[in-house]
Amino acid sequence: MTTPPGWKVSGQNEISRPFDILEAWFHRIVGGGNLTRERDSFGSNYVVKLGFPGSVADPIPYLRRAWLVTRYLHPQLGATYSSKSLDDLRYIIRPLDEQIWLQTTFFVEQGPSATYSSAEDAVSKYLSKSTTTAHWIPATSEFMISPTASSPL
């Protein structure tokens, strides 16, 4: 795993860095990590509407691969935060397990189990989560990246 600028290698092959001044301020105003659905409202979703050539019958394998490559290129996507106190807030990036990463962060939003029916629908259903997630919404051809409110993005 490459170490992004400003990050340090720590135990168990993890990399970490302390929160910067703005991240610490944000963390404090949203309740010191005690986020609820109503308080986790500073996040933004990033959405693109995609089109595929007729030769691509199923875009999901391509999107999963692109999401995985994006994680390799930007390890910060997998960052979670921990703290022993409000004065010791740190982002931590653990070694990447490809299968677990895809199972826990890539979602196809279709059928009765879909969380979102469109990217617009995501605005009213902003869910708290521990890391950034990607959502493919076939009904609208939208690919949405949804960072956590405390994400280092």
UniProtKB/Swiss-Prot annotation:
Gene3D superfamilies: Chloramphenicol acetyltransferase-like domain. Keywords: Nucleus, Transcription, Transcription regulation. GO terms for cellular component: nucleus. Its main location: nucleus. The keyword Transcription applies. InterPro entries: CAT-like_dom_sf. It is found in: Nucleus. Trichothecenes are sesquiterpenoid toxins that act by inhibiting protein biosynthesis. Transcriptional regulator that may regulate the expression of the satratoxin biosynthesis SC2 cluster, one of the 3 clusters involved in the biosynthesis of satratoxins, trichothecene mycotoxins that are associated with human food poisonings. This is Satratoxin biosynthesis SC2 cluster transcription factor SAT15. The lineage of its organism: Eukaryota, Fungi, Dikarya, Ascomycota, Pezizomycotina.
